[in-house]
């Protein structure tokens, strides 16, 4: 039986660390990288008699997410105790949400693949709920024992649960990337996967093509890169298919992915909800979100990627590809919008070309984010404007861009004037240069008249060289054709 006889079913649970300054139920700092246990309050270490106090900022970030995905923001939601024992969980339970989460439903549209084979798909979300993170067990520096760091205990998380709507690792990665971009766009999570701010758990099962019943799922825990997510799913899918075809059965389990071997390995048998004995936390009142509170958060929301993409297409005349690329991250979209604001909507397309082309390449080479680009939106807009009004050619523009990057002038105009780069558009001056080139390159002239088009390009190159790149390429082409025709 071939792989094509099987259908893959994937659902993702993503833990997004909310970017509040303090923890969800205490005033302790959430800053990353502190010495062990210096950011753990009495609440975090579960001293007797302490009570949790809900962080308003964490709730507002959950509301923001719910609004961004078109979900229902619950007027009333409830915190519950998820009971289990682990050394880095001092209370013996985790405060989470179970029956009544703060965000219910919602959708995210993803784009899978590139070029002609690309397609869009809508992934439904089940819920997103607030919860606290656990601490961290430390094994490396200890022999015969483990250390516990409770700095992370109580850090606010939004657990975002999708429906099992994805049918390939490519779709799962596209969903994770889109979600990652969204939480950063609406500024609820910094998305730093290396620091654990955005972690994915993948629930994977397989079933025969055409079957309605889901197969038994296995959950791959704590995937902290998109590459590992894809590799882990691909391995797990093949393992499940091979196991079933060899006569085995899949047992529900939690597994870990080993990046060194590219394999998943069993961690423990998978628990169901009843194993955690959820019940409402008696120390926390139900969370009530009034219509006024929700409306205020709505009023503070930025323009969302899909809305901005549609506006770029409809109002600025960009292609769907360009609009999608420019709205892939908030930083790029903000830079591009500022460039167009300075240059004018009529130059939206050349501005897009420069942001996606030369600027992106230069930033990539220098390993810089666009937010700290040495060339500002206003400077790039000035450069695009000088190309548009034929002050400089595209070739000269690249030199001006490099000069702006290196800080050799405050604006394109200043560099053009200082370095004498203004394009030569005087027909008489260009004709004089053409005459000199034709006189010195009789062989190329004869070859052109014999039907060799390459000879024409060689002559254009000689004229541009004679003008030190300053002659208008369009005028050179036009005048040279006339001369050769005569």
Curated annotation (Swiss-Prot):
Heterotrimer of A, B and C subunits. GO terms for biological process: glutaminyl-tRNAGln biosynthesis via transamidation; translation. InterPro entries: Asn/Gln-tRNA_amidoTrfase_suB/E, Asn/Gln-tRNA_Trfase_suB/E_cat, Asn/Gln_amidotransferase, Asn/Gln_tRNA_amidoTrase-B-like, GatB, GatB_C_1, GatB_Yqey_C_2, Gln-tRNA_amidoTrfase_suB_CS. The lineage of its organism: Bacteria, Pseudomonadati, Pseudomonadota, Betaproteobacteria, Rhodocyclales. Signal peptide: none annotated. GO terms for molecular function: asparaginyl-tRNA synthase (glutamine-hydrolyzing) activity; ATP binding; glutaminyl-tRNA synthase (glutamine-hydrolyzing) activity. This is Aspartyl/glutamyl-tRNA(Asn/Gln) amidotransferase subunit B. Pfam families: GatB_N, GatB_Yqey. Belongs to the GatB/GatE family. GatB subfamily. Allows the formation of correctly charged Asn-tRNA(Asn) or Gln-tRNA(Gln) through the transamidation of misacylated Asp-tRNA(Asn) or Glu-tRNA(Gln) in organisms which lack either or both of asparaginyl-tRNA or glutaminyl-tRNA synthetases. The reaction takes place in the presence of glutamine and ATP through an activated phospho-Asp-tRNA(Asn) or phospho-Glu-tRNA(Gln). It comes from the Bacteria. It catalyses: L-glutamyl-tRNA(Gln) + L-glutamine + ATP + H2O = L-glutaminyl-tRNA(Gln) + L-glutamate + ADP + phosphate + H(+); L-aspartyl-tRNA(Asn) + L-glutamine + ATP + H2O = L-asparaginyl-tRNA(Asn) + L-glutamate + ADP + phosphate + 2 H(+). Keywords: ATP-binding, Ligase, Nucleotide-binding, Protein biosynthesis. Its EC number is 6.3.5.-.
